[in-house]
Amino acid sequence: MSLSRLIIHQFRNINSATLDFNPKINVVVGPNGSGKTALLEAIYFLGLGRSFRTHLTSRVVEHESKSFTLFSEIQNNNGSIPIGLQKSKSGETLLKINGSYCKKLANLTQYLPLQLITPEGYTLLSGSPKNRRAFLDWGVFYHDPIFYPNWSRIKRLLKQRNAALKQCKTYNELQIWDNELCILSEEISQQREAYFELLMPLVKQTLADFLPDFSITSQFFCGWDKNNKSLQDYLFDNFYRDKQIGYTSAGPQKADLRFKINGIPVSDVLSRGQLKLFVYALRLAQGLFLNSFDNKQCVFLIDDFSSELDQNKQQILAKHIINSNAQIFISVIAAENIDRLFGQEQTVFHVEHGKITVE
């Protein structure tokens, strides 16, 4: 899957643009505030139905306009799929996929598997477990078709259980939720762990180039110590504690990935630049996995490619990007090193004051 064409109207400071993309590497060049990140944001919106910069649609729509419109053509093994998306400042949404209107923006995710890497991306490792669960679940979603309906059901059960915790007086009143919750939680955890075990060899291959001086260990934590007791036992034993805090304290919603160097979390050992390289290794490995195991092409959005990376690391990273068999969109402030890094593989777009031209 790759994005072959994008038409933009009234998105951020981009009033109008029609762009045909390289199936491999696309470099977006422009000074800060020019609109290069807005271009990546528009692509992200088409892939996930939301922005990575704000949750307010009004901030994405061009200042004096009422709505923005995005139209794209996505190439897959069966040909071209047209997708159109319009959102207004008032929140109204129109989505059309392959000629049919769709009500759910979540339907977009299956057509354009997107990975976003920003200068703040190191929070995947230094931030909360929620970030690492999202990373893991992105891969499981595309690898195992049963995962998404199972996880959606678990989230509904947890919402109902947490509401019931505030009302019930004995654990028996929660059994109606916990019986199904425990079965689905075991399935979800097995799906996550199986994917993680397949992914990590690809991560370690990339880390050998990116961070050769460090020996990094990895561990999947399912959300409870299943070697000690079952989730059913945890929920029973923690009933009064959970009732006091008002939510369920064990289960797949508490899962995490743990990366350590000599027993110490990587976020306490590595610099920000090194953490960024680690994140690149994780994301690129997911792209390789998607291509090798699931026969799908990943689309990478890399904002501020050279941030906190010396020329040697940029060269190593560029080599892995070229070999990733993914479609890449990279934003940079200056283009002087682009040919050195990517040769003739790329198409270069220049952005200034929201106007986009092709080199």
Curated annotation (Swiss-Prot):
ATP binds at residues 30-37. The keyword Cytoplasm applies. Its main location: cytoplasm. SUPFAM superfamilies: P-loop containing nucleoside triphosphate hydrolases. Pfam families: SMC_N. GO terms for molecular function: ATP binding; single-stranded DNA binding. The keyword DNA damage applies. It is found in: Cytoplasm. Belongs to the RecF family. The RecF protein is involved in DNA metabolism; it is required for DNA replication and normal SOS inducibility. RecF binds preferentially to single-stranded, linear DNA. It also seems to bind ATP. This is DNA replication and repair protein RecF. It comes from Psychromonas ingrahamii (strain DSM 17664 / CCUG 51855 / 37). The lineage of its organism: Bacteria, Pseudomonadati, Pseudomonadota, Gammaproteobacteria, Alteromonadales.
